[in-house]
Amino acid sequence: MATIFDILNTLNNNNNNNNFENCKRQCPINKSNKTIIDKLPPMDVTMTNDKLIIETELAGISKDHIEIDIKDSILTIQGEKKKNLNKQQQQLVIEKSTSSSTLDSKEDEPSIEEFEDDIKPKSKSDNTTVSTTTTATTKENKEDENKTKSTDKKFISERSFGNFKRYLDLTKILYQLDLNSINTQFENGLLTITINKKLHYSNTIKININ
């Protein structure tokens, strides 16, 4: 019969003290989605007389960005820790998205000038006007970026962001667990997963002969 020590031993062997290098080894690049795992959140696993408790630290992460599933006896906790933007950065993002959507809508609408352009050949002066306008727009965008860079001065940058993923192999004790009783709670950056144990369980299945 597997014990909680078997799980912890497997957990420690797989994660190797949560080193970042081992994170890349244990959580390789997903070939289909090209996702790189940047973080390996710390985890505590506790087995009581009636339940299995899994606690994972996910500080600074919204619950909407966390995914939990069990597949082939493997519990997977994954998601993304996104960087928060300040008010100035948020305003720039909104302005850029608004300006791009406005330009797209204008391009979709036919104008009288477009019909005239189809009839009349374009002159060199028209081409010069278009290129001048494009150059001016590019300069304005660069000036906005330079303003943002000049106002943001970071003295210390120790926080990490990006995708995270954590595995827990439940193969040795899965027969003891009632998967229909899984309960999750996310509070103050701590994700707690509780799985009740079955009242009656056995790792041996008796087969009758007909």
Curated annotation (Swiss-Prot):
Residues 126-138 have a biased composition (Low complexity). SUPFAM superfamilies: HSP20-like chaperones. InterPro entries: A-crystallin/Hsp20_dom (IPR002068), HSP20-like_chaperone (IPR008978), HspG1-11-like (IPR051779). Residues 93-151 are annotated as: Disordered. Residues 34-210 form the sHSP domain. PROSITE patterns: SHSP. Keywords: Stress response. Residues 139-151 have a biased composition (Basic and acidic residues). The keyword Cell division does not apply. Belongs to the small heat shock protein (HSP20) family. This is Small heat shock protein hspG6. It comes from Dictyostelium discoideum.
